[in-house]
Amino acid sequence: MDYDNMVKTLEILKDVVNALECADKGNFDKALEYLEKAQKVDKDNPLVLYVKGIVLKLKGDMEKAEKYFECLENIEGTSLLSLGNLICLTFVKGEYERTLKYIEKLSRLSKPCYLSPFHKALIYIEFGEFEKALEALDEFLKIYPNLTSILRQKASILEILGKLDEALDCVNKILSIKKDDAHAWYLKGRILKKLGNIKEALDALKMAINLNENLVHVYKDIAYLELANNNYEEALNYITKYLEKFPNDVEAKFYLALIYENLNKVDDALKIYDKIISNKNVKDKLLIKSSILNKARILEKLGKIEEAVETYNKAFDNNI
C-alpha cells in the first residue's frame, strides 16, 4: 500500500471509529455525518457501508438500512454479516419470500448460524406449514439441543398437529432442563387434558399457576377440569378467580352456570343462562343453544313445564 492509500485508509478508519462512538451513545445523526464523510473518500468501502447499515437500523430507518446491506452484498458477492441483517430486516417487514431467499444463501455458507432455521421456522408457522416449521426447528435443535424456548415452540406445533405423545415427550424434556418453567407446565397440562389424563393435567396446570400467578388464563382450564371431575367447589374457586380478571368471557360464565347447577344454586345458574341468551354480542350459536337447553332442563326439573317447553322450542329456532 502506497503512502496516499494508507492515509486515505486511516482517515476512513478514524471516521468509522468516531461514528461507532457516536452511535454507541445514541447520537445516530452525528454518526451518519462521519460515515458520509468517509464515503466521500471511498464511496463503496465495505466497512463504511456495513456500519452505516447498522446505524440506520438502530435509528429505525429500515428501508435505508436494507439498501446499504444489499449494496454491500452486491459489492462483496457474499457478505455473511449483510445476509444476517437482511434476514432480520425483511422478516420484520413481513417480506417472507425474500427472507427465505437470504436464509437459503446464509445456510449454505454458515450452517451453525441460528438465524436461518429460527426465522425459517417462524415464517413456516406464519404460513401454516407446520411440518416444514418442525423441520426448521429440528435444524435449530441440532445446533442448540437444550434451548427450552425452541423446544416449547416445537411442542406447541406437535400439539397443533395432534402428535400429542411426541408433544408430551418434548415438554418433559423442557422440564428435565428447567423444572420451574411455568409455560412448559401449562403446555403439559393442556396436552394431558387432550389425552384424557385429567388428574395429571390438573397437577400440571396447578404447578404452572403456582410458578407464575400471572398466567390467569390457566384458572379457566383448571376450572373446566375440576368441573369435569365433579369437584364443584374447586371449580367455583378457580372460575371466580378467572372471571375477576376477564369478566366478559361468556364461555367462562357458561362454566360458572354449570357449576351453580351442580351445586343446586339453580337461581344463580338461570340468571347467567338468561344473560348469555339475551346478549346480542355472543356469536357462538352453540353456546347460546346450550344455554337455552340447560335453562329448559332446569325449568323442567322445577316443574315449570309450560315455560320449559317454550324454552326448548327456542333452541330449535333457526334464527339463533
Swiss-Prot record:
InterPro entries per record: TPR-like_helical_dom_sf (IPR011990), TPR_rpt (IPR019734), Ycf3/AcsC/BcsC/TPR_MFPF (IPR051685)
Q: Where are the TPR repeats?
A: 12-45, 46-79, 80-113, 114-147, 148-181, 182-215, 216-249, 250-283, 289-320
* Assigned keywords, A-Z: Repeat, TPR repeat
Top-rank lineage group of the source organism = Archaea
PROSITE patterns, per the entry: TPR, TPR_REGION
Q: Would you tell me the protein name for this molecule? A: TPR repeat-containing protein MJ0263
Organism in which the protein naturally occurs: Methanocaldococcus jannaschii (strain ATCC 43067 / DSM 2661 / JAL-1 / JCM 10045 / NBRC 100440)
